[in-house]
Amino acid sequence: MLSYKDIINKIDQLEEANIILSALEFNVFSVLEKNSLQAKQVASLTKTKLEGMEILLNALVAMGILNKNKNIFTNTPVTYKYFCQTSPDFRIGTVMLMMDSRGEFEKLS
């Protein structure tokens, strides 16, 4: 049986997964490629609002998924290698299958 703490940990994991999936949906890793960009540049290239993109990028930094230095964001070697469309090792297929099943329990009500 899961403890209260275990259940809260699972909820936290879901929140982190949703942050990563949102970054993939907006092609954040491909927009960054090997570049160093400010949040306003990423927002412009992804056609998103600056405030929301700043929150997303900073959440990714807090999770260790992106790097940030003086308000400049960059991919980590892992995010470039596997989640950037220009990388020869791009592996988005599995993640996209997971994204397709995100809403499968929304139809319960």
Predicted features by range, described:
Residues 1-109:
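N-terminal accessory segments
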